[in-house]
Amino acid sequence: MCTTLFLLSTLAMLWRRRFANRVQPEPSGADGAVVGSRSERDLQSSGRKEEPLK
């Protein structure tokens, strides 16, 4: 009984490791250029630094 439980838990862990780490590629632009992530574009487009709240 314990051996079966150990075997099933090991298989479940290996199965999750194999299939849980799928990374979806971001859609590129129409001209094939690589587009940065949304947070990078937001930081570049703002051009100013945030002032700390007092």
UniProtKB/Swiss-Prot annotation:
Membrane topology label: Lipid-anchor
Alphabetical list of Pfam families matching this protein: Rod_cone_degen
Biological processes, Gene Ontology terms: visual perception
Record's GO cellular component terms: cytoplasm; endoplasmic reticulum; extracellular region; Golgi apparatus; photoreceptor outer segment membrane
Localization per record: Cell projection, Cilium, Photoreceptor outer segment; Membrane; Endoplasmic reticulum; Golgi apparatus
Main localization of the protein described in the UniProt heading: other
Residue numbers spanned by region Disordered: 24-54
Basic and acidic residues bias (residue ranges): 38-54
One term of GO molecular function: opsin binding
Lipidation (S-palmitoyl cysteine): 2
Tissue: Expressed in retina.
Posttranslational mods: Palmitoylated at Cys-2. Palmitoylation is essential for protein stability and trafficking to the photoreceptor outer segment, but does not appear to be essential for membrane localization. Probably palmitoylated by ZDHHC3. Phosphorylated.
Keywords in alphabetical order: Cell projection, Disease variant, Endoplasmic reticulum, Golgi apparatus, Lipoprotein, Membrane, Palmitate, Retinitis pigmentosa, Sensory transduction, Vision
InterPro entries reported in the protein's UniProt record: PRCD (IPR027937)
Job of this protein: Involved in vision.
Family from the record: Belongs to the PRCD family.
Disease tied to this protein: Defects in PRCD are the cause of progressive rod-cone degeneration (PRCD). PRCD is the most widespread hereditary retinal disease leading to blindness in dogs and phenotypically is the canine counterpart of retinitis pigmentosa in humans.
Subunit note: Interacts with RHO/rhodopsin; the interaction promotes PRCD stability.
Protein name: Photoreceptor disk component PRCD
Organism: Canis lupus familiaris (Dog)
